Amino acid sequence: MNAAVETPEILVFTDNAANKVRELIDEEGNPALKLRVFVTGGGCSGFQYGFTFDEEVNEDDTAFEKNGVTLLIDPMSYQYLVGAEIDYTEGLEGSQFVIRNPNATSTCGCGSSFSA
């Protein structure tokens, strides 16, 4: 595993996102959980984002820590997420995790699909 780093120029994990993840982990009652963010093929624009909780840290994962929360990214997904911002927003249309990705050449209206 690559060391946990606080490097905003590589990836921004906002306070809002970290605090919401902490709240969700507390609700699960398992402090070993970490948030895994990944990119997979699919969606209407070619790639889509995914979020899951994971207790396992793979040797080649990159880990980011913020407010006591660990964010994990696998090497394939990492290349698509460099420079991205992971945020949590609440508004009239509901609440959701949002990825603002400067590497995306286009995005879908659903907000979870992009092309690079």
Swiss-Prot record:
Alphabetical GO biological process terms: iron-sulfur cluster assembly
Keywords assigned by UniProt, alphabetized: Iron, Iron-sulfur, Metal-binding
A GO molecular-function descriptor: iron ion binding
Cofactor binding, per record: Binds 1 iron-sulfur cluster per subunit.
Cofactor annotation: iron-sulfur cluster
Role: Required for insertion of 4Fe-4S clusters.
Subunit structure, as described in the record: Homodimer.
Family, per entry: Belongs to the HesB/IscA family.
The protein's name: Putative iron-sulfur cluster insertion protein ErpA
Native species: Azoarcus sp. (strain BH72)
Highest classification ranks of the organism: Bacteria, Pseudomonadati, Pseudomonadota, Betaproteobacteria, Rhodocyclales
Protein encoded by which gene: erpA
